[in-house]
Design a protein with these regions (language model features):
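Extracytoplasmic
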Residues: 15, 38, 46-50, 96-98, ...
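Aromatic- and charge-enriched surface segment that lines or borders ligand/interaction sites
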Residues: 1-33, 46, 52, 142-145
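Gly/Pro-rich hinge or "lid" segments in bacterial periplasmic/extracellular proteins
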Residues: 69-126, 130
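Short, well-ordered beta-strand elements
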Residues: 1-2, 20-23, 51-53, 99-102, ...
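A bilobed periplasmic-binding-protein/Venus flytrap-type ligand-binding module shared by bacterial periplasmic
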Residues: 56, 115-119, 182-186
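Surface-exposed binding/hinge segments that line
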Residues: 2, 8, 35-80
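Ligand-binding "clamshell"
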Residues: 37-39, 163-176
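Ligand-site clamp/hinge motif
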Residues: 4, 118-164, 180
């Protein structure tokens, strides 16, 4: 793997092959999908921007396993302190990631506020300055918030009457798919 040379964590420290190796080993030891990384025997780090994965057998799903949903690259300089990564204090305070948005505020049961990472390694991205994720537990309250324009998107279980009600709103575009969840955007 060849890493993007100007990619950094939110604290400004560079993302290195050591972080990749550490992240893979952490996932192999702790993640519910650790079997996705079972064929990875070792991760060599010949230089800061190169990680070489040595496999015990071919792994056709390696690219999927390396996706951000299964393998987020975490900073070794923070999580390499020997504490349990699942209970690490930096999971909830002074969170450091590497994505397009930085966590600014998390209020359990209320909201999550993310702000644009000005140092994101892809120029011109992200396109938004801020994302506010409101936690609205009640379906009716979610629908009312959509109708009033208080939220721009909602994902929830919606029955036919909810979908028909929202389709009547001039400010909403409703896209429903089969399955247990649907999302609405205004």
């Amino acid at each position: 793997l060849h890493l993007v040379k100007n990619a950094t964590f939110h604290d400004g420290k560079p993302i290195t092959s050591e972080d990749v190796a550490f992240s893979i080993e952490t996932v192999k030891a702790n993640h519910p999908f650790k079997t996705m990384f079972e064929p990875v025997q070792t991760v060599e780090t010949p230089d800061p921007h190169t990680a070489v994965l040595k496999l015990s057998k071919p792994h056709p799903a390696l690219e999927l396993a390396m996706s951000s949903q299964l393998l987020s690259i975490i900073p070794k300089h923070i999580y390499g302190d020997g504490q349990d990564p699942k209970k690490h204090p930096r999971n909830s305070e002074n969170v450091v990631g590497s994505g397009a948005f930085k966590l600014v505020e998390f209020k359990k049961g209320q909201h999550i506020i993310l702000e644009r990472n000005e140092n994101y390694f892809i120029e011109g991205k992200p396109c938004l300055d801020k994302i506010v994720i409101r936690i609205i537990k009640d379906n009716n309250a979610r629908i009312i918030a959509l109708e009033k324009g208080e939220v721009h998107m909602a994902a929830f279980e919606a029955g036919p009457s909810d979908i028909n009600r929202l389709k009547k709103s001039k400010n909403l575009t409703v896209s429903a798919t089969s399955g247990p969840k649907c999302g609405m955007m205004s």
